[in-house]
Design a protein with these regions (language model features):
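A hydrophobic, multi-pass inner-membrane permease signature
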Residues: 2-285
Length: 285
C-alpha cells in the first residue's frame, strides 16, 4: 500500500511539474511575441506602399513593394551608415582597450580602494545625460568637434566604459585563480598573463560586452542629433528626416528602420553563441 501511495504521489508531482513547465513556456512565448510583434509590423509596413500603410483598419494582405526601400537608398543613406559604422567600431575598440585593463585592476590584481573606484563608475551612470548636453555642446563647439565623428567617439567611449568595466570585471572574477598562479610560476609577465591566459577564457564575456556597446552606440539619437545633425548625421538622425511637416511617410520610415536594424541584427546573429555564453559566464558563481 505504501508503495502505491508513493507512486501516486510521484505521478501527481510529475504532472504538476509538467503543467507548471508548460505554463511558463506559454508565458515565455507570449512575452516573446509581444516584444517581436512591433518588429514584425515594422518589416511588414516597410514592404507596403504609402497608401497601404495609412489604411484603417490596417491591411494584413497587401501587394509587397520595394518602392520605399529604393527611396531610402536613393535618399543618401550611405554617408549616415558610414558615420555610424565608424563611430561604433572605433568607440567600442577604445572601450575594450581601456575597459579590459581597468577590469583586470579591479578584479584579479585589485588596486587600493577598488570599491570606491567601482562606485565611481556606477555613479557616472546615475547622472542624467540630458543635463550634460549644454556643457558638452559648448566644449565641442570650442574644440571644433561639431559635425565631427570624433565628438561622438569620445562621448560614447565615456558612456560605455563604466558598463564595460563592470561587465568584464564580473567575467574575470570567474577565471580560476589556480590557472593564473600556474602561469605566474611559469614566468608569465603581466602582458602574457592578460593576452595568453585571461583573454582566451574571457572572450565570450568580452564579445557580449562589445555587442552591447555596439547596440547602444548604433541606436543613440539624442547626442548625435545635437552634435552631428548638420553635416555628419548618424543613422538614427537620418531616419528623422522622413518625419516632415507636410506628412509622415510611415512606410518609408519603416523601411529606413528595417535597414538601420539590419547590421545590429546581423552582428547579434553572428555572435549569438558568444553572446549567450558571455552573458551567462558571470551570472553563476
Amino acid at each position: 500500500m505504501a508503495k502505491g501511495i508513493d507512486t501516486r504521489y510521484r505521478h501527481k508531482r510529475l504532472s504538476r511539474q509538467w503543467a507548471l513547465g508548460h505554463f511558463w513556456t506559454l508565458v515565455a512565448w507570449v512575452c516573446a511575441w509581444i516584444m517581436f510583434f512591433p518588429v514584425l509590423w515594422m518589416v511588414l509596413t516597410a514592404f507596403k506602399q504609402e497608401g497601404d500603410a495609412y489604411t484603417d483598419p490596417p491591411r494584413i494582405v497587401f501587394h509587397p513593394s520595394l518602392t520605399e526601400f529604393s527611396q531610402v537608398f536613393s535618399g543618401g543613406v550611405g554617408p549616415p551608415f558610414a558615420h555610424s559604422l565608424f563611430v561604433s567600431l572605433v568607440s567600442v575598440v577604445l572601450v575594450l582597450a581601456l575597459g579590459i585593463p581597468a577590469a583586470y585592476a579591479l578584479s584579479i590584481r585589485a588596486v587600493k580602494r577598488w570599491r570606491d573606484v567601482l562606485f565611481f563608475f556606477l555613479a557616472t551612470k546615475m547622472l542624467p545625460y540630458v543635463a550634460a548636453i549644454v556643457p558638452i555642446y559648448i566644449v565641442a563647439l570650442h574644440l571644433g568637434l561639431l559635425d565631427n565623428d570624433w565628438a561622438l567617439v569620445i562621448l560614447y567611449t565615456g558612456f560605455n566604459l563604466p558598463l564595460a568595466v563592470w561587465m568584464i570585471r564580473s567575467f574575470l572574477l570567474e577565471i580560476p585563480r589556480e590557472m593564473l598562479e600556474a602561469a605566474r610560476i611559469d614566468g608569465a609577465n603581466l602582458w602574457v598573463e592578460l593576452t595568453r591566459v585571461i583573454l582566451p577564457i574571457a572572450i565570450p564575456g568580452v564579445a557580449a560586452t562589445a555587442l552591447i556597446c555596439v547596440i547602444f552606440t548604433w541606436n543613440e539619437f539624442f547626442f548625435a542629433y545635437f552634435l552631428t545633425a548638420t553635416k555628419g548625421p548618424t543613422v538614427p538622425v537620418f531616419m528623422v528626416s522622413f518625419l516632415q511637416t507636410e506628412g509622415q511617410y510611415w512606410a518609408r520610415l519603416a523601411a529606413a528602420a528595417a535597414v538601420a536594424c539590419l547590421p545590429v541584427i546581423l552582428a547579434g546573429w553572428i555572435a549569438q553563441k558568444q553572446l549567450v555564453r558571455g552573458l551567462s559566464l558571470g551570472a553563476v558563481k
